[in-house]
Amino acid sequence: MSKESQVNKCDRYTWSQTLNDCTLSIKLENPVKSKDLFIKIDNDHLTVKNLITNDTIIDGKLYKNVKKSDCNWTLESGKNLEIELFKLKGQEWWSCIIQGESEIDVTQIKPQNSSLSDFDGETRAMVEKMLYNQNRKAQGLPTTDEEEKQRIFETFKNEHPDMDFSNAKFN
């Protein structure tokens, strides 16, 4: 997955993020096996320890809550630990991973363009409708909402032929 923010460096790890997840990368000094690591991901806390050296790499309260059941970690070549945290409330930037650590300026993050296929069905339909209506307005044509209002008005006029709408004004 491509990360939308630049790589951010902390004392013991680097991290990057998208609006929905954060990925931490930890370079271990000496190769270890996964059983040599203690990694505990709670909804609001992260602990990473090297059991061989008894070194605590990370132990702190997360910036915001995560979906604990979706989070995971992998160890590559015994030296590269990667932890993926899925944000409980997506569609937001985190200024840090662990509270109290140095923070980044989230207003400086330049997200990548997203594709309509990145959205769930309901959101995608809403975005497609907005784009369609924007295009219609640019062409001087009525939007879907304006067309619907006009259709309802025409139906009402047909159901009430005895009413005079000649001087009616609508915005």
From Swiss-Prot:
Keywords: Cell cycle, Cell division, Cytoplasm, Cytoskeleton, Karyogamy, Microtubule, Mitosis. GO terms for cellular component: cytoplasm; microtubule. GO terms for molecular function: unfolded protein binding. Pfam families: CS (PF04969). It is found in: Cytoplasm, Cytoskeleton. Residues 8-98 form the CS domain. It comes from the Eukaryota. SUPFAM superfamilies: HSP20-like chaperones. Gene3D superfamilies: 2.60.40.790. GO terms for biological process: cell division; karyogamy; protein folding. Required for nuclear movement. May interact between microtubules and nuclei and/or may be involved in the generation of force used to move nuclei during interphase. Belongs to the nudC family. This is Nuclear movement protein nudC. The lineage of its organism: Eukaryota, Amoebozoa, Evosea, Eumycetozoa, Dictyostelia.
